[in-house]
Design a protein with these regions (language model features):
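Active-site metal-binding loops of divalent metal-dependent hydrolases
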Residues: 18-20, 130, 179-181, 260
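Structured beta-strand-rich core segments of catalytic domains in phosphoester-bond hydrolases
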Residues: 44-134, 246
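Active-site environment of divalent metal-dependent phosphoester hydrolases
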Residues: 22-25, 52-56, 75-77, 133-136, ...
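Metal-dependent phosphoester-hydrolase catalytic domains
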Residues: 1-5, 162-176, 182-269
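N-terminal, active-site-proximal structural segment of metallo-dependent hydrolase catalytic domains
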Residues: 1-61, 72, 76-78, 121, ...
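His/acidic metal-ligating clusters that form di-metal
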Residues: 112, 120-126, 144-178, 190-193
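Acidic/histidine-rich helix-loop elements
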Residues: 12-31, 72, 100-103, 131-150
Length: 269
């Protein structure tokens, strides 16, 4: 049970998305991130921007969590691992793929199929850091045009993996997709995702936080609470009932990164 954020009544699963910002200051924030994860007590955490400094979290949190997709199949570093509570779940399968359309190899998605050790229920989590085009990439392309096209393909790539998992485990497999999508709620890529999955902020039955700008620029910088919306999302399919959708923006939450964590409390149908 979380010390800071008690679970909603009836919660079966708490899932978080967390971009930890891999700038040089990460080495100083690793202990803060570890403490925050312990306090939030999520069952599954989809992470982004986990460089080699950030992998220290795997050892620090090893008493409670196991990491999936620390590397890609070819042995190269994966920046989008998934953490899961090994006391509750067994890993059925997992892996990762670089996004087909990207500027750097930091943009990928990972996946994990987990089984509840007590109930035998299986569910899948996919986790992405979607494409963005920045000036430093020195590409003859814009983030608004080509970048959005890339992000649209990133979404399609994840939906292809989701469909593969449906074929293997059945159409009733609960699926959650976490991540930094680098797109606002009205972006084309998010619109595409919403045609196939539900934004947890839209379907939460008890409470939600829709308008908090989940990206806030620098660790410790207060968030804008309206007028921009999030770029970090958790999407679910019909077999996941979302109770609460949360974008914490208190001092502890904004200190760990330039992104607020996003988490949901949910049940699996």
């Amino acid at each position: 049970m979380s010390k800071l954020t008690p679970r909603a009544n009836g919660t079966e699963l708490r899932v978080m998305s967390s971009n930890i910002l891999f700038e040089k200051c990460l080495v100083d924030r690793v202990p803060l991130i570890a403490d925050y994860y312990r306090d939030c007590a999520a069952d599954v955490i989809g992470m982004q921007e986990v460089n080699r400094v950030g992998t220290a979290l795997f050892d620090i949190l090893a008493d409670g969590y196991t990491a999936v997709a620390k590397t890609h199949a070819d042995g190269k570093h994966c920046f989008t691992p998934i953490l899961y509570r090994h006391d509750r779940f067994a890993l059925v399968e997992g892996g990762s793929e670089l996004h087909r359309m990207r500027a750097t190899d930091t943009k990928s998605f990972s996946y994990a199929v987990l089984e509840d050790k007590e109930t035998g229920k299986k569910f899948a989590v996919l986790n992405t850091h979607s494409a963005i085009i920045l000036a430093c990439h020195k590409l003859e392309a814009s983030n608004a045009v080509e970048g959005e096209q890339w992000r649209g393909d990133n979404v399609l790539q994840m939906l292809e993996k989701r469909d593969e998992l449906y074929q293997k485990y059945g159409q009733d497999l609960p699926v959650l997709i976490t991540g930094d999508f680098n797109a606002v709620p009205t972006g084309d890529s998010i619109t595409t995702m919403k045609q196939h999955m539900h934004d947890s902020a839209d379907v939460a039955t008890l409470s939600n936080e829709k308008n908090v700008c989940s990206y806030h620029g620098r660790p410790g910088t207060p968030c804008r609470l309206e007028g921009c919306g999030p770029i970090d999302f958790i999407f679910v399919n019909d077999t996941v009932k979302v109770l609460t959708h949360n974008v914490p923006h208190d001092e502890a939450a904004i200190a760990i990164s330039d992104h607020c964590p996003v988490y949901i409390d949910a049940t699996l149908n």
